[in-house]
A protein has these predicted regions:
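N-terminal, positively charged/glycine-rich alpha-helical extensions of SAM-dependent methyltransferases
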Residues: 1-34
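Class I (Rossmann-like) S-adenosyl-L-methionine-dependent methyltransferase catalytic domain
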Residues: 28-29, 48, 116
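Conserved alpha-helix/loop element of class I SAM-dependent methyltransferases that forms part
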Residues: 32-62
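A short, aliphatic-rich alpha-helical micro-motif
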Residues: 58-59, 123, 145
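Class I SAM-dependent methyltransferase SAM/SAH-binding core
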Residues: 63-118
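A short acidic, Gly/Pro-enriched loop at the edge of an enzyme's catalytic core
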Residues: 117-128
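A short SAM/SAH-binding and catalytic strip from SAM-dependent methyltransferases
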Residues: 128-142
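A short glycine-rich, Lys/Arg-flanked "PGG" loop and its adjoining helix->strand segment in the class I
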Residues: 142-152
Length: 152
């Protein structure tokens, strides 16, 4: 992360601080319920997928990166539908909650500590990148969008 511009480093540090607090106040207590929900909700308005149809289409057999996974409920949902997700997040507390929830639910997939602005994956590593409430809202779009394109 030291090779990133100072504004990006400061933004990442602020996001980690905010999401550590959010995890303590909400995410940690609700992770298992979110992981096991039959239908996911999208974005800050909580739009139910069942009401809008799946914006992702068929995901079985796809390698999917969730950029800014938080407690990784979307990655869990993808795994339950036969995808091979990888959850990426910069916040250790949220990843710890996700790992605990993996143990509780038996739903396994890789969880990686990292940032959308500098993805730790090789070129063309994924079939799809999703960001339900993560990188798309909190990361520098001039950095994370090209990074996501690179790994597709």
């Amino acid at each position: 992360m030291n090779d990133l511009p100072e504004p990006t480093r400061a933004s990442v540090a602020g996001n980690i601080e905010r999401w550590t607090k959010a995890n303590r106040e909400y995410g940690d207590a609700h992770a298992q319920r979110q992981w096991l929900a039959e239908h996911i909700t999208w974005g800050q308005f909580g739009v139910r997928e069942v009401d809008i149809g799946s914006p992702l289409g068929a995901v079985a057999g796809l390698d999917i990166l969730e950029a800014g996974c938080g407690v990784a409920y979307l990655s869990a949902w993808l795994a339950r539908r036969g995808a091979r997700p990888v959850g990426l997040d910069p916040t250790p507390a949220q990843l710890a909650t996700a790992r605990r929830t993996q143990t509780e639910t038996g739903i396994e997939f890789p969880l990686v500590e990292g940032i959308g602005e500098s993805l730790p994956f090789p070129d063309a590593a994924f079939d799809m990148v999703v960001s339900e409430y993560g990188a798309s809202l909190w990361a520098d779009p001039y950095a994370w969008i090209p990074e996501c394109a690179r790994v597709l």
